[in-house]
Amino acid sequence: QANDFLEAFRNIRDELAKYLGAVDKLPIPDMKALAGKIKFDLYNLSNLFDLPQRHKYDRFVKDRNREGGMEVNVISFNYTSTLERILAEMQHTVMPQKDLTINAPVHIHGTLDDGLLMGVNDSSQIANTDFRNGYLVPDLFIKPLINKEWEDGIDTRCREMISQADVIILYGLSIGATDRMWWQEIANSVSHGFQALVYSRYDLAQPTTRKDEILVQNKLMCSDLCNKMDVAPINHTTIFSHTLPIRQNRLFHFDIDD
């Protein structure tokens, strides 16, 4: 029954919130170093690419010819306040830069304080046909419908952030199917705009200095991203032309002991 399912779902959500709430209270080790690393990488993004991608990124930045400082907007798919805590540390202890503005992160799935948004991307991802065709489960389990019903404008704000960005960085994301609308939003924006799409995934490939292997790894990362974003094969070439992979976990690589 739908009511039983939703009750079980609420229990899972509440237990997850309790667990994450406890984790969120734990101290963050070397927070000043983390804040400094984020800032350093944002200013030195070009140096994190392999040579072909570095040249491409440098040409992109030169062609944009933007005056003024760097403004960073963050769409977080996380529930915790970890990033906010690190950014606060950056503002207070890391030497501030007048030309760098990092706006407060927007949590597309909610926070521990205002509630966790959990569920699927659309009705096709609800396997049970009775649930899928009913009223209760779709309205409380399809994430875009929940945001729309809440009417706080968060989806609109995130779309504007994506469409107005010069550089879009995908970091620390699974690129899962339950958020397909956002990956397709990014793919569509990149396909029709003059944007660079930087992709940093957790890289398990063995370090190498061989040029042929580096080229293969970069191409495979682009292909992996297109597949995860559910980009139609006919559009892969367009996405490839805008995508700049960062290999070997160079971006925001934090040397923290387990």
Q: Which residues fall in each region the model found?
A:
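SIR2/sirtuin-family catalytic core signature
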Residues: I154-D258
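Conserved active-site beta-strand-loop modules that form the wall/rim of enzyme catalytic pockets
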Residues: A104, L116, D166-I169
